[in-house]
Amino acid sequence: MIIFKNNEIRFNSILKSILLLLLLFINGNNCKTAQQFLDENFNHALFREHQLEKEYKTKQLVKDDPNMYSDWTEVPAATAEAVTIMRGDDYYYDYDKEQKIEMIVFGSENAISSGSAQNYWYGQTCEATNFNNTPTTTCPNDCHSYWGQGQCNETSSTCICNYFFIGDDCSENVDPQHNWDKMNCNGGRYCPPIYNYPTPRSCVCPPGQAGLECTVCLNNEGCQALTGNYSSSFECNSSPYTYFEKSYSCVVTSAEVNGDLNNSTASASIDCQFPGGNYNTQTGVCSMNLYYRIHGSPLYFNCSFTECDRTILPGQNQSIVCQNSVCNCTTYCGFILDGLISAVTGEATFECGAQTNPDGTSNCLFSQYTINQMLPAIPLQCMSGECIDVATGAPTPPPIYPVPVASMSFLYIYVGSGVGFIGLTLLIGAIFLIFSLQEDRKNFKEDTHLVCELSFHNISCYVNERSGFFGKDVKRKQILDNVNGVCPPGQLTALMGLSGSGKTSLLDILSGRKNVGNIDGKVLINGAPVGKNFKRISGYVTQDDIQIGTLTCREHLMFAALLKLPENMSLEIKQQRVASVLEELGLTRVADNPIGTSEKRGISGGERRRLSIATELIVDPSILFIDEPTSGLDSHSASELITKLKQLANNSTKGQRTIIFSIHQPSAELFEQFDNLILLHQGNPYFSGKREDSVNYFIKQKIAGMTEFEQQNYRMHLKNPADFIISMVTDKNCQRFNSTYVDSRVASPFYQSTSPALSSNSNNSDINLNHHRIINNPHNQNIHHQQHHHHHRHIYGINGPSIDNNDSDSDSDERDHLLASDNINNNNNNNKVKNNDNNNKNNDDDVEDIEEASPIIVVGNQGEPLASHIKIGKVEEYATSFWTQFFVVCRRSLLNYMRNPFLLRTTYFVHIFVGLTLGYLFWKLPANLEPGCQNRFGAMFFMTALLSFGSITSLDLFYNDRIIFIRERANGFYRTSAYFLAKVVTDIIPMRVIPPIILGSICYYMIGLRPGILHFIYFLISLVLTSTVASSMCMAISTISPTFGTANMVSILLLFVFLLFDGFLLARSSIPKYLIGLVWISFMSYGLEIPVVNEFNGLWIEYNPPNTRPTYADGLEFLSTIGANPNRLFTDMYVLLGMIVGYLLLAYVFLRFLVREYR
């Protein structure tokens, strides 16, 4: 044995020298690290040498007699143990118990007290009946002989250790990895494993003691062992209140903390000391050891707290608040977490409930200011014990909290019940109110078809045109100038004129759509001003036929019927109305054909035009406005359409309709079908009256001065009256004939009055046709006139004699037919005329200079007034409720998605493909720093960027359908809010919710992200929220952008800025302070932080740098390096939800107030 010891010393010296030289050669610039590495490897080498020695002895025993140990009867225990380990047997023979012992570890995993558990370890049982391991007189050290770790050599007074332990007292395990985290068992037995078996370490406590470190008393006998005083004056107090020195042994029940420890249930030992039993005055100190496993070792970190005070909370719960905190990590923490734990300062709080659980434990809560920045308050389940010397006086009991528990509970119950009752009452009341309003709407009987006469008086309109680079030059442009007229029901009224004459502007003003420019004048319906309900009794067909091309004609009209017909009308009646309109406009043959898109041809142009008219006829409007109904149609289609319109005006089953339309230069066939004509040129009215009178009016101007033969010849060759009328207006010589006509009109029998009202109003008033307005009002036939003396006029550069007509009969004859507008100053011509007419003998000889004016003469019979004027009853602005409009628009949008599935299919295919690709590239990432953490972070960044940029497709949502929305909203189809909500819902659910879920579901487990259903759900929520925020932002941009290119450019620019400041490409610590606001407004920073925190907060990361022993770091350390806050998981979700609401609200405001057709 002496020879062996000498060889051992020689071997150790040689080995240590070789390792030292090798390390110095490899890393000569870092001697300290090399020395540490040498010490660690030397201990391993020593352990290996110890193994070789045991193996040598075992082989020698087996060599002497191979069959000697087959029945395990005579082999010494130490030798048998060594043989068992070397042979790999599952048991060994214990000679003291004379039985075979299985080499397993078992016991109650959830037991806080290890005193009652039987924990076995490889090679030696921890079960003990005698805990008196005191040194003997011959051996100054214990040698842990009872435990079989060593025995005292009385000759040398030293301990001789067995094969598994070393040290002066044989307390150190031969494997150094099992010594640094050795627990202080306070008289109990510490059970470490041997060799490299990953078995639990724990304290086996003596009778009467319990807890992780055997510091909790179970009874009075335990107090005697703990205090070393075997008198009977010590009593064990198991309440959660701390009097002098209380010990708590706790199990951590926090899922987050245990998740950080690789889902191992952590434990904590807490001790608090106070100098006296006075509960209210003295301050004390506390300490805490946080262990990795439920039964203790290894130690994670420990903390000391000072300036601690005890208080009693409601419910008699105890709270210990300490002002100062100091914490230290063990080597188990890792480098990064060591720095974080060492920085712990500030207040710490330890609270325990007065009520105990059935197993005798209490529910407690530990929180610390610095730790709370990374983790919330840590819930604990603790057993407690304190040994109190009653001989020195009983401690002061804790005070009673002022508010009794029962009273507080009843107060909560009363308040909660009251609030709940009030809330329930309000909810029921709101539901009842909404239901009542809906029933009132459904039961409301609207008026039948209204026969309406439309009249307009003194309609003028001008706009300010800006020019120049900066638009500073403003020029006023006259669009309409004092236009008057009457449109009777049952007739076609045509607004005719060349392009730019003001036809569409007048049509827009009459229909209430004109929203640009300054407008003067009055528009009356049956003598009453136009109200908000005008949309319900009128329809407007624009020049452009814009419909959803994927729908059929019947579907298009059915959606219009569902939106514009009353809700009390049954679905069957609405379907009959659709079929009737289709038949009325000759669309039955193509009723089930698609309308057609730019990619796929559908119905013809004429059929589309008739479909646009049919859309407005669904509600049987009293007044129908049509802008250029024959535009783009051939002569046959145009004639057929005008014929249909004439039938609709005069042959309605519910009453006559008033139809007003604009037209350029119709054919003779079309012109003959008009009932009334309003002629405009350059904004000025030239005629307003019956269509047949217009031809005679302009012919008499044309043939004035011709011989009778020339007049007959001219009438014979007149082919198209419309062409003739337009040519008369544009002819430079027209004013010469107009002047002649005005001079001779009094004697013409064509202008004899047929109105008794006007005839009875005959008087001797003088009328100047150029300076006065005679309005044929169908309701009172009042004539406004004024006498002017010695007025002269200049017509397009032609001077004519002034008119001084004193014949009252002539005046009365003309009042029924002439509609003259006021004299308007022409600012473009400043010629002034001085006319000395010697024939005006009844007037003064004074001569007045006047500004040049156009001859505004509007002539014709405006039709007899209605015998009885039908008043417009109570008609609501919209025929259907908000929810009806919402569901109908939702259904139409979804149907459009199904009929045009390319975008939907492409989106789903891309997300499935990307999910599989990411799963393949990042397959089962390991839980290490590189590539595990790097690739996890990269995969999350890629998904965030993909979903954000993929949401640019939302730009089409409101931009492509903008014209349809403007037209339908203007026609009273729906509210802006109902349309907006329907479009948002039908876009977000199929395009922003389902695709991210598909993407995340495919790649989550393929990548190997954190297991657990909650973590998976949080991950999907982050993807959905990110996609929805990006989509909402694009919606807001598209609603306000004038062009699609502008919306696209702004969206991409913002997405790139947000991508740069999301925390992946640019570290937050390196962002300048004046740009840090971009981080807070970047939705990607929140969208990326959620999955990162969800993944790394609780992930145990292996750090394995080259040439060093691998260590483990908490995921919190990684989060701190990238600037992520682990406590912002739910806060980030709330922020993203707020951004969604904010962007959508902004988009709605833009859509409601800024998106409109400027006419």
From Swiss-Prot:
Matching SMART domains: AAA (SM00382)
Mention one GO molecular function.
Answer: ATPase-coupled transmembrane transporter activity
Q: Which residues form the ABC transmembrane type-2 domain?
A: 902-1154
Q: Name the residue ranges with Basic residues bias.
A: 785-795
Superkingdom, natural source: Eukaryota
Q: Where is this region: Disordered?
A: 752-846
- Record Gene3D superfamilies: P-loop containing nucleotide triphosphate hydrolases
- Record: residues binding ATP: G497, L498, S499, G500, S501, G502, K503, T504
Give the location in the cell: Membrane
| Record-level GO BP terms | culmination involved in sorocarp development; sorocarp morphogenesis; transmembrane transport
Q: Name one Pfam family in it.
A: ABC_tran
Note the SUPFAM superfamilies from the entry: P-loop containing nucleoside triphosphate hydrolases
Residue ranges annotated as compositionally biased, kind Low complexity, are 759-768, 775-784, 822-841
Q: Which ranges carry the ABC transporter domain?
A: 454-707
Q: Where are the transmembrane segments?
A: 11-31, 415-435, 909-929, 937-957, 1005-1025, 1047-1067, 1074-1094, 1135-1155
Topology within the bilayer: Multi-pass membrane protein
GO cellular component annotations of the record? membrane
- Give the UniProt keywords, A-Z: ATP-binding, Membrane, Nucleotide-binding, Transmembrane, Transmembrane helix, Transport
Q: Which family does it belong to?
A: Belongs to the ABC transporter superfamily. ABCG family. Eye pigment precursor importer (TC 3.A.1.204) subfamily.
Name of the protein: ABC transporter G family member 24
Species, as recorded: Dictyostelium discoideum
Q: What is the lineage of its organism?
A: Eukaryota, Amoebozoa, Evosea, Eumycetozoa, Dictyostelia
